[in-house]
Amino acid sequence: MSEVFKSTDQARSLLLPKLGSLLQKTDEMPWQDCGAPGFWAKPLVEDASAGVRTWLMKVDTGAFSDMHAHNEYEQIYVLTGSFYDQDGGYGPGDFIVRSPGAMHTAGSDDGATVLLFYSVATDESG
């Protein structure tokens, strides 16, 4: 599978808290290039042992990512702007879930901000 969106943030804790809460002040975080032109991320949680990633992603006007897939479930909640893939277009409040390995494109005609959740697939026994 072609994994195009990758975090490079190792400067702060991204692990799920063992106790209490984890606060990420997203307004104070820089946008990071995440491997595809015009796609920028603020990684909020990246915990490989728990099999989860949560990102805030900004998609520039006109940005497009070719067909690719992720090894995890991908859940997308559109916060602002417009976002599209090979199946259609989405706006604020729309929620999309992709299965692991689902080939898809991604892009925006006029810019978008989305919240992304990635989680590993587990078998039915948990």
Where are these regions (language model features)?
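Conserved hydrophobic/aromatic beta-strand scaffold that supports enzyme active sites
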Residues: 41-43, 54-58, 75, 95-97, ...
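Short acidic-glycine-tyrosine-enriched beta hairpin
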Residues: 84-105
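Glycine- and acidic-residue-biased ligand/ion/polar-headgroup-sensing regions
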Residues: 60-61, 69-86
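A short, N-terminal "cap"/entry segment at the start of jelly-roll beta-barrel domains
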Residues: 1-50
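Ligand-binding loop in jelly-roll beta-barrel domains
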Residues: 100-125
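Short beta-strand/loop turn elements enriched in aromatics
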Residues: 43, 59-70, 120
